[in-house]
């Protein structure tokens, strides 16, 4: 059984949805190593009379905020080095999808104004379906008998993501629906794998942001990618892909005009 943990990272310009995949056995060992690393760090912090941390949170660690506010950059890098040692020991696969929202709004403006109940709900539903397709391409196309359970970091969009999952795996045109068993949401407090998933989601998001604000790739992501145990595929839905999506919607008669454009809550536009 494979288990995939899903988390998102976004701003007004880019939306990224990432999934970390491995076997239940690997996740059990990975979680134990992660817990030991966190406990060891907290013992040191407590001995120094400093605030302990409840979890690894990528954005806070990267920006030295909240529980990481009194850290130095050397401490930050040392802790990331300890985390990297865990990734080095256990094989983890990542599948990620990012959308250039500036291009999306420019090419398909109808989605922003007419998605029901709002564009964010539409976005979560659509990207959930796209992510499942990409997980299937990477895992199920090689092993049609694979079984994959998905776990998402709890959010206000749980219900729309579950609905999108259900529609995708029950779609008769989706050849690998049988590979996906469950889609559940939980919090990081009860699920250690959501912490490394948060890390990778943040790194994928920051890498996708290079399209908006050109800069060198982050060293932290380079170090992850260089690990033999860390593999995967990250895609950006750019202007070309969004234009193709719009063409498909137009061909289906889904966005013939603003008055007729009525996308659903699950990330799809109804056909007519």
Language-model regions, residue ranges each:
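Phosphate-ester processing/binding pockets and catalytic centers
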Residues: 1-4, 8-272
């Amino acid at each position: 059984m494979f288990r995939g943990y899903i988390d998102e990272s976004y701003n007004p310009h880019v939306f990224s949805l990432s999934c970390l995949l491995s076997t239940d056995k690997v996740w059990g060992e990975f979680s134990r190593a992660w817990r030991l690393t966190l406990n060891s760090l907290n013992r040191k912090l407590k001995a120094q009379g400093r605030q302990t941390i409840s979890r690894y949170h990528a954005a806070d660690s990267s920006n030295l905020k909240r529980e990481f506010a009194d850290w130095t950059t050397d401490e930050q890098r040392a802790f990331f080095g300890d985390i990297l040692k865990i990734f080095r020991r256990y094989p983890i696969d990542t599948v990620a999808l990012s959308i250039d929202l500036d291009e999306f709004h420019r090419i398909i403006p109808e989605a922003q104004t007419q998605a029901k109940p709002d564009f964010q709900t539409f976005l979560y539903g659509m990207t959930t379906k796209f992510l499942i397709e990409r997980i299937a391409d990477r895992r199920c196309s090689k092993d049609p008998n694979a079984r994959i359970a998905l776990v998402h970091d709890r959010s206000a969009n749980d219900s729309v993501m579950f609905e999108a999952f259900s529609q995708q795996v029950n779609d008769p045109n989706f050849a690998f629906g049988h590979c996906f068993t469950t889609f559940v949401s939980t919090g990081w407090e009860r699920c250690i794998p959501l912490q490394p998933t948060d890390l990778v989601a943040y790194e994928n998001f920051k890498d996708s942001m290079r399209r908006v604000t050109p800069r060198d790739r982050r060293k932290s992501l380079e170090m992850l990618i260089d690990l033999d145990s860390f593999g995967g595929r990250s895609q950006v839905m750019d202007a070309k892909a969004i234009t193709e999506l719009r063409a498909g919607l137009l061909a289906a008669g889904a966005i013939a005009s603003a008055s007729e454009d009525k996308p659903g809550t699950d990330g799809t536009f109804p056909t007519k």
